[in-house]
Structure formats: C-alpha cells, structure tokens
Amino acid sequence: MNNWILIQSLVVAVSAGTPLVLAGTGEVLTERSGVLNLGVEGMMLIGAVTGFWATSASSSPVVGLLVGAASAAAFSMIHAVLAISMRVNQIVTGVGLVILGTGMSSFIGDQGDPAVVRKLSGGIFEPVFPDSFHDWPGIGPLLFSHDPVVYVSWGFVALAEWYIFRTRRGMNLRA
C-alpha cells in the first residue's frame, strides 16, 4: 500500500510540476544570458488566465494552450524590451510584471463562470499512452499516464540542455 501512495504522489508531482518545468526552463535560458527575470510568476499568471479564458470561450484546450503561451511570451517580450533595449532596472520590471500579472489574473479570474471553472479544473488532455501501459508495476503510472504537455515539457528540458551545452550559441550564452 505504501508503494501505491508513493507512486501516486510522484505521478501527481510530475503532472502538477509541468508548468514550473516549462517556466524554469525558460528562466534558465534567461539567467544564462545575464538577464535577471523576476517576472516569471507574473508571466505564468497571465498565461494561465488567458489560457483559461480562451479555453472557456472556444471550448478547445489546444486554443487555450496556444493563447496562454502566446500571452506569456508577449509579457516576456515586454520585459525584454524594458530590461535590455530601454535599460530599465531588471528588478523593477520583474516585480512590476508580477504585480501586473497578479492583478490582471485576479480581475479576469473573478469574471469567470464557476461552472466553467469546475469543468476545466480536471485534466482536459487525454493521456498519450494506452491504459495497458499504466498497469506496468512501479514505472507504468509514473511514466505513461500523462498528457502530451508533460512529455513536451520534458522535451523542452532536453532541448535546452542540448542547446546550452552542445552548440556554439549555447557556449556564447554561457560565456
């Protein structure tokens, strides 16, 4: 019984940690380039609330995922323009993005329909692998019971590692 609890805890941790893996991968690239980005949490909040809004408006989780990623990228570009091009203090812009993201997500989130929130609060993407893979003892649920976003995030981590440590541009980034 204790093994089951441990495995289920790890499965939930992998699933719930996916947004942090994606944000952390981007943050590693940002920090390696010499930019202090304290606005990651604000970008995540903006991406989450706009993704939720787009999913509830279009009834398509793929549209919501793309809109959330695009809006977080837009806020990332705002931070880049302010911090790099305009030479504004990186701490101030990062904290400002967190405050803006918190306020906007709270305001937009309050406008949401509670029925839609309940509907979208569970997993909206289907697992990639068939159910027979989930039955493998030990590693089955941990490796094969996730939706495509989890596997894409693992791919981004591997791609970022390859880029940073195996390419000339990555070497320039680390220098």
Indicate residue ranges for each PLM-predicted region:
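Interfacial loop-to-helix junctions that mark the boundaries of transmembrane helices
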Residues: 3-12, 62, 87, 138-150
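Single transmembrane alpha-helix segments in multi-pass membrane proteins
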Residues: 8-57, 65, 74-91
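Short cytoplasmic-facing helical segments at TM-TM junctions of multi-pass membrane proteins
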Residues: 169-175
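Hydrophobic/aromatic residues within the transmembrane alpha-helices of Major Facilitator Superfamily
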Residues: 17-18, 25, 100, 104, ...
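Membrane-interface starts of transmembrane alpha-helices
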Residues: 59-67, 90-93, 97, 145-152
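N-terminal presequences and immediately downstream first alpha-helices
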Residues: 1-13, 107-108, 115-116
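Residue-level recognition of pore/gate-forming positions within transmembrane alpha-helices
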Residues: 48-49, 72-73, 98-102, 157
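Transmembrane helix-bundle core of multi-pass membrane transporters
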Residues: 102-166
